[in-house]
């Protein structure tokens, strides 16, 4: 048999190229949600019990929703950011405040032992006032892209020591990055002390769709901040670029201050 003729009769199968690895699996919708406190509260002046004496926390907390593996070119992801059924609520996360309230309840029970009803025994004044839940405020482009956080990634990078959503996305300054905010412009606190707020993301639609109780989709804690008595309050700060931009984009409830003219700012 001529040399090489056997290969024509019994050709060897061509080696197959290795199949490409499957694309990374996108996490479930619920696990994609994250909360990022874009603007931290720093200080506040303790306010009175009446609505006319409200003193908003300065600066007002601004919370942003982030999505794992968010793609700004994906209409599905953009629609998810624009879901009007999202809401973020807050509560006092300071355990010392809870202990103080328990002590106050014990004192009230002691006052009730004489059998005389008092108006201040039947009603407790909440320490926090303002809208307890905020609706989403969506913008097509982040008004302060230089401080915009990157959305988390499901692909871990060993060279990044911090979680992805804590890494600032400088590329956002070159892109029109959409964003959804929850802005607590009227949050006030009645008693002086050290506070820390817990923010929780929920979706009213989960109740409508499933008939079950509304789950907490994500949560975030603020940095500790101090609420001062009126005589010790250091004054209001100038508004941030983010706050000014959000007001220009239509969130009119924000009261902005600038050029060193913050209301209540003490003169040196």
Swiss-Prot record:
Segments of this protein annotated with the region Disordered = 1-124, 142-165
Task: Please name the PROSITE patterns in this protein's record.
Answer: VELVET
Query: In what ranges is there compositional bias, type Basic and acidic residues?
Result: 1-13, 92-121
Q: Which residues form the Velvet domain?
A: 28-257
Q: What happens when the gene is disrupted?
A: Leads to a marked reduction in penicillin biosynthesis.
A Pfam family of the record is Velvet
- What's any GO biological process attached to this entry? sporulation resulting in formation of a cellular spore
Q: Which domain of life is it from?
A: Eukaryota
Q: Which GO terms describe its cellular component?
A: nucleus
* Comp. bias regions, Pro residues: 14-26
Q: Tell me where in or outside the cell this protein is found.
A: Nucleus
Which UniProt keywords are given for this protein, alphabetically ordered? Nucleus, Sporulation, Transcription, Transcription regulation
What is the role of the protein in this entry? Velvet-domain-containing protein that acts as a positive regulator of sexual development.
Q: Which family does it belong to?
A: Belongs to the velvet family. VelC subfamily.
* Subunit and interaction comment: Interacts with velA and vosA.
Q: What is this protein called?
A: Sexual development regulator velC
